[in-house]
Each structure stands twice: as structure tokens, then as C-alpha cells.
From Swiss-Prot:
Organism, scientific name: Acetivibrio thermocellus (strain ATCC 27405 / DSM 1237 / JCM 9322 / NBRC 103400 / NCIMB 10682 / NRRL B-4536 / VPI 7372) (Clostridium thermocellum)
Function (record text): Catalyzes the deamination of 5-methylthioadenosine and S-adenosyl-L-homocysteine into 5-methylthioinosine and S-inosyl-L-homocysteine, respectively. Is also able to deaminate adenosine.
Keywords: Hydrolase, Metal-binding, Zinc
Annotated substrate binding sites: 95, 147, 185, 215, 300
Protein name according to UniProt: 5-methylthioadenosine/S-adenosylhomocysteine deaminase
Gene that this polypeptide is encoded by: mtaD
Length: 431
């Protein structure tokens, strides 16, 4: 379907940070065909749908670069705990009760929440990833999914085969909406041979790795006791960092760790809400950016956030570093927005395809209703998005050239059915 968006104010997130007013944007066969402020650009374009964006702001869809979407089932459960108590004492025991079908419904709820809050792409690491892929395929969202070749140490060969099969089935499927990486949960759950094997598998099938890195001080202390080196150092030693990497958190990096991550081209995912809620700390994002490290944003799971709202992550990322360092110039609005769009696209392996509004890019966009009291007057659109906008301001979402939400109505998800099923699942597993 060819879509024309007219009367559009557009934040492009391109290299020049262009912001256009009263522009026309054409979508053809899932790609951005043109962007122009002159009506002459329309003469050769035949639109199947015309969207009048007067009073709305068009911008790239947000990229949630680290989450566990099926954990919506555990939302508002086991709060106010340190990571180790939260994970080992509460979350893991409940997760043992979750069935593949449970994960399917939990993921659908997460996707519904993400689309309604302007997220068009996400990176997911969780259980029963076949069901996560099914939910992604049905809903039209874009995703980087990962699967481990070592789910069960007693069945490593069988799990490795299933990992290869998963990659073959889902990688680059659905018009390229799905990418598949290798899951390496963390250094504290994977021993050195497992880390090496995972790196070898990623190299063999030419893909990347999604891993948690140095989220807490305890993780760093335990790694130093066990290996005599930091998690970043052991990842470097075992080959984990020799492939494209999505490294979630990276809260406690020494200068040496940061040098490794910079030199290896590791993508860091900043999860400010989750890190604060679990008392993990605050990542040195400004130092990372000054070192040329690509930093994107993520929500983490709804069990530790407790939502999947990327507007909150942008807002918080733009505030906490100013306060901690007593420097209001750190992580400006434009920087926070780039972290949630183009940087996220690069981190997830979609760089050059999404994350900005430019001719030839895939049409992943959102329209924000700017006619709201809390946004008036707009003055600076980028600042308005980062500092004033709410997720509920997202009116329309387009992914891969398809309208998946319009006038806040989801087109690919039965929202009420999903909510009903997740409530029933939560009653069963949390009792």
C-alpha cells in the first residue's frame, strides 16, 4: 500500500538532525519514497491512503534495544528487591511454571504495549523464543530475537541443533522484520566453555550475541573471584566480543572495560529505569559516548521497570546524568532521541534500514498528537518529545509501511483478549 502523509512536521533523526515543517512524506512498498516540503513532489505519486498530519509530529519509531517482553506476566510482582534476590529468589521459580502458550500471550501483551507507546522495533531475550517469534510475525512489529544453544547442559547437542533450526527458520523472515542473534544470558549463568561455544556458534552462522554485562557490583566481584577478570574481560577472552554484540546495562565499567567495549565495537544498552529500580547503579553513559561507543536505550522487562515505555527511558536518560554530574549540558534532548532511534537501530543490526526518516529507509514511523495541553506550546519539537510527551500521545504507528495502529486503535492485536488471557495466566503462576 502506498501512503501519503501530508502537512507533516517531521523529526528526521538524520545525520543533519533536520526538522521539517509542513512537509509531505510518501511511503511506497514499505519504504520511504520521498520527503519534501514542496507539493510538486506529489505529481508522480499515487497514494492508496492519505493521512493528514496537521497537528501531529512524524518521527522514526522508537527502538527498545533490550527487553524480555513475555515478562509482562510478572508485572508488579516482587518489587523493591536487589537484582540477585529478585531474580533467584522470585522470578526464576515462577518462570519454571510458564508454558510456551503463556509466553505467547505475555509477549502479545508486551508488543501491544510497545506499539501503543511508539516502539516499532525491540530486542528480546526470554523463554520459549519460538512463541516470541510467532507473536512478532503475527503483529507486524520488527524485532531482534535471540536463542541460546545451551538451554540445558545435559542436552547441549540437542539444544544446539534447535538453535540452528530456529536461526534458519526465523532469521531475516517476514520481509526482514526478524533478525536472530545468539543468547548468552550473562557471565554469571554461563561458564567459560559455554561462553566459548556460544561465540563459536555465532561466528559459524554469522550472527551476533545478546548478553547482560556488568549490571551490578556483585556480578563484577563474583567474576573477579571466579576468573580473575571482569565480565567484559572474560567476554573478550572467550570470543563473545568478536561478533556484533548487544550488551545490556554495562553499569559498572572500569576504564579498562570501557576500552575493551570501545575497541571491540560493542553496542551498549542503557536501561535507566530498571537500573534505578533494582538499585544497580547508573551507567557512565556520557563517558561511553565520549569514547565513541554506540549507546542505545532499553526498558528491560516489565517485571523490573514496570512498563515498556520508551518515552520514560528517553526522559530519564536525559535527566539523571545531568543531576549525577551536576552538568545540565549532558545527554541533551537530541542525544536521548538518537539513543532511542538511530543508535538502537544500529545496535540491533538494523542500521541503515530504520531509525531515521530518509528516502530509501524502511517506513517505520510514528505520529504523535501534539495538540495536548502538556505539549503546548511546542516551540522545539525534539525537546517536546523528550521532556514533555507521554506515550499516550502516540496516535498512529506504521511499521514496514503497514499501519499497525491508527487513532490509538491496534490493527493486528485483539487487546481485550490478550489482557484477559494474561490476567488468567498471572493468577495461575503467582498463586
Amino acid at each position: 500500500m502506498n501512503i501519503l502523509i501530508k502537512n507533516a512536521d517531521i523529526i528526521t533523526c538524520n545525520a543533519s538532525d533536520d526538522v521539517l515543517q509542513g512537509a509531505f512524506l510518501g511511503i511506497k512498498d514499505g519504504y520511504i519514497d520521498f520527503i519534501d516540503t514542496k507539493e510538486d513532489a506529489l505529481k508522480d505519486f499515487k497514494a492508496d491512503r492519505i493521512i493528514d498530519a496537521k497537528g501531529k509530529l512524524v518521527m522514526p519509531g522508537l527502538v527498545n534495544a533490550h527487553t524480555h517482553s513475555g515478562m509482562t506476566i510478572l508485572r508488579n510482582f516482587a518489587n523493591d528487591l536487589a537484582l540477585e534476590d529478585w531474580l533467584f529468589g522470585n522470578v526464576l521459580p515462577v518462570e519454571e511454571k510458564l508454558t510456551p502458550e503463556d509466553i505467547y500471550w505475555g509477549t502479545l501483551l508486551g508488543i501491544a504495549e510497545m506499539i501503543k507507546s511508539g516502539t516499532t522495533t525491540f530486542a528480546d531475550m526470554y523463554l520459549h523464543m519460538e512463541e516470541v517469534a510467532r507473536a512478532v510475525s503475527e503483529t507486524g512489529i520488527r524485532a531482534n530475537l535471540c536463542r541460546s544453544p545451551l538451554k540445558d547442559s545435559d542436552k547441549s547437542v540437542e539444544d544446539a541443533v534447535r538453535c540452528f533450526e530456529y536461526f534458519k527458520k526465523w532469521d531475516n523472515s517476514f520481509n526482514g522484520r526478524i533478525k536472530v542473534y545468539i543468547e548468552v544470558h550473562s557471565v554469571y549463568l554461563f561458564d567459560e566453555p559455554s561462553l566459548r561455544m556460544s561465540a563459536e556458534v555465532a561466528k559459524e552462522i554469522n550472527t551476533g550475541i545478546h548478553i547482560h554485562v556488568q549490571e551490578t557490583l556483585k556480578e563484577c566481584e563474583d567474576s573477579n573471584k571466579k576468573y580473575g577478570m571482569s565480565p567484559a574481560e572474560i567476554c573478550c577472552k572467550t570470543g563473545i566480543f568478536d561478533v556484533p554484540v548487544i550488551a545490556a546495562h554495562c553499569v559498572h565499567l572500569s576504564d579498562g572495560d570501557m576500552g575493551i567495549i570501545r575497541d571491540k565495537g560493542v553496542n551498549v544498552i542503557h536501561n535507566p529505569t530498571s537500573n534505578l529500580k533494582l538499585g544497580s547503579g547508573i551507567a557512565k553513559v556520557d563517558d561511553m559516548l565520549k569514547n565513541g561507543i554506540n549507546v542505545a536505550l532499553g526498558t528491560d522487562g516489565a517485571a523490573s521497570n514496570n512498563n515498556l515505555n520508551m518515552f520514560e527511558e528517553m526522559h530519564l536518560a536525559a535527566l539523571i546524568h545531568k543531576g549525577v554530574h551536576m552538568d545540565p549540558t549532558l545527554i541533551g534532548a537530541s542525544c536521548a532521541l538518537k539513543m532511542a532511534t538511530v543508535n538502537g537501530a544500529k545496535a540491533l543490526g538494523f542500521g541503515g534500514e530504520i531509525g531515521e526518516i530518509s528516502k530509501g529507509m524502511k517506513a517505520d514511523l510514528i505520529l504523535i498528537d501534539m495538540d495536548k495541553t502538556h505539549l503546548c506550546p511546542v516551540n522545539d519539537p525534539v525537546s517536546a518529545v523528550v521532556y514533555s510527551a507521554q506515550s499516550s500521545d502516540v496516535d498512529t504507528v506504521i511499521i514496514d509501511g503497514n499501519i499497525v495502529m491508527e487513532n490509538r486503535e491496534l490493527k493486528t492485536i485483539d487487546e481485550e483478549k490478550v489482557k484477559f488471557n494474561v490476567k488468567e495466566i498471572a493468577k495461575r503462576v503467582l498463586r
